[in-house]
Each structure stands twice: as C-alpha cells, then as structure tokens.
Amino acid sequence: MERPHRRSAAEIVKGEQSVLTISEADVERLLDPQSLIDGLAEGFRALGRGEIQTPDRPEIAVPGKGFMLSMPAWQAGGPMMVKMVCVFEGNLDLDLPNHLALITLFDADTGMPVCVMDGTYITAIRTAAAAVLSVRELARRDAKVATIVGAGVQGRQHLHLLPLVRDFDEIQIYSLYPEDAENLAATAPNARAVRDVEAAVRRSDVVCLCSHAYQPVIEADWVRPGTHVSSVGYTPWPGELPQDLIRRNTLFVEDEAAFRPQPVGCAELDGLDLSIAITLGDVLNGTAPGRTSSGQITVYKAMGIAMEDLVAATLAYRRAVDQGEQASARF
C-alpha cells in the first residue's frame, strides 16, 4: 500500500489561524469571583502535588520607568499560558493603570495559539482572590472585623471578595489619601473609611495589606493574637510587610520560590530561610497544618504566581467557548 506523501518541514507553513480575543470588559464579565476562588484552591492543590509547571519569571527593566515580566504556566489537560505583565508606576500620572498585562493561551497538543486576552483585570482579581483564599483557609471562623490598607485596585478587589469567605460585620479601609478610602468605602454597605491605621489594625481579625509602599505600613506590635494578615504588595526591600511580624509568627506562601531574589520572590522574605514557611498548597492538601489555635497569628505573603493566571485565564476562555463566542482574529 502506497504511503501518503508527507510534506517536509520546509514545505509546511502555519497558514491562517483563528484566535479568540477577549477584551478586559469581557474577561470581567466571564469570570465569576466565587468560581475563581474555588479554582485557585484546586490550582494550589495541584501545584503542591507538582502537577503544574511554573518556570521562574524573567524580567526586562526599563531604567527609571518600570519593568516587564514573562510568566508561563501549564497543567496537563489544559492550554499552555504565558502572561506578559508591565509595571510602570509613572502611568498613574498619565491616567493609565500602573499594571498592564496580556495573556496568550496555546493548544498543548500543537502549540498553536488559541486565545489572546487582556490580563490586566485578571492580574488584579487573581491576586486578591488568592489572598482572600488565604483568609478562607487561615482566618478564625468567627472573624468579624477586617482592615484593608490601601484603596487602589487591590483594595477595591479585596473589598468585593472578602464577603465571599467570611461574614464580616465591618470592613475598615485606610489610605494615605483619605478621599480614596471614603470613595471606596461608599461602594460596600459594611465598609467605612478610617484615619487611624494603628487603631484599625489593633481591633481587626483580618488585615489585608494592598499598598505600593516601599516601607512597612503597619507595625508587628499592632497585630493582636488570632489575627490573619495578608500582604500582596510587590515592591523593593523592605516592602509593605514588617519582617519582624513574619519572624514572630506563622508564615504561609504560594510557593517556595517566594524566598528567591526579586523579580521571582518577595522583598520582605529577603534573608529568611524557606523552612519557616508553609505553602498554601500543602495546607489545602492536608500535608501541613494551617491555623492551629485561636490565638495564633497567621501571615500570608504573596508574590503572585503564573498558576493563578493560568487558572483565571482558563476559566474565562472555557466560559467564552461554552457561550459560543467566535474567534475574532486571524494570524
């Protein structure tokens, strides 16, 4: 029987490929926050079992302007993903977001691109959703008062997601810019702006640090026994989270890579040994303890990992496909 002719590599061209494009507005429409939190929990479990590839993220720095990171990830059974994220703090003066991102999904069988989507909203909501997942897993069940330090993008996302995991009586919002705190507090019925961050932290059961501060925004002695503290700020040393708070209490991280030098790891963990930390995946898999007493202070320090982007982007893409959305670009 004659074998069919197989073209040589030199004869094969990619040709036009239909690619779904998803705008920032459509990503926001497609992503359900509760599904994202639950999806991230599964993602952390898989990461803890070694089932997700997340190579270290390389950085391109533009002196005096900002930097760009490349964040790839893949889990068997799903698409490959890469997010390109730019952090340019000066954009705020130009009325532009200081975090901008673009995500591309690739078919894991062929390597062909299948979707290009905005990653700016995904970066914002997945960061907050992972931190709020830490609240779900590590905060006391009877937590009633939360404080958010920072009234920017992360402060807003935290305010909207925290009620999904605890029934808070009150959420306090502090910002160096009181008007921003007032405006954000007005968007939620049980939120209020505060001017005294120390007093707010001292009466809190949950404290969420959501700033761009290059220095600690709270002091370790303000945090009362039984509190859960989360920190999502990503800045150079020493960062928003005081290191003595980390040293004195129980630390939880997304991944052991958090202890590597930036841009991979967290500035606040510089000089600390990774043996002091427990990964969120190990807690969720039951291979390490979470909260062990009502008086324990738990601390979650986020670095932001590509697994979170993979989970969020895959959720948005699959929902778009399920809703019959058609490819809108050809390459």
Question: Where in the sequence are the language-model features?
Answer:
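Phosphate-binding loop/pocket of nucleotide- and phosphate-handling active sites
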Residues: 315-331
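Rossmann-fold NAD(P) dinucleotide-binding segment
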Residues: 213-228, 241
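Glycine-rich Rossmann-fold phosphate-binding loop(s) that bind the pyrophosphate
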Residues: 151-152
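N-terminal ligand-binding/catalytic initiation module
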Residues: 2-3, 8-124, 132, 142, ...
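NAD(P)-binding Rossmann-fold cofactor-contacting core
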Residues: 164-187
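Rossmann-fold NAD(P)-binding glycine/threonine-rich loop
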Residues: 232-288
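Short acidic low-complexity segments
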Residues: 189-204, 218-221
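Short helix-loop-beta connector
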Residues: 138-145, 167, 224-225
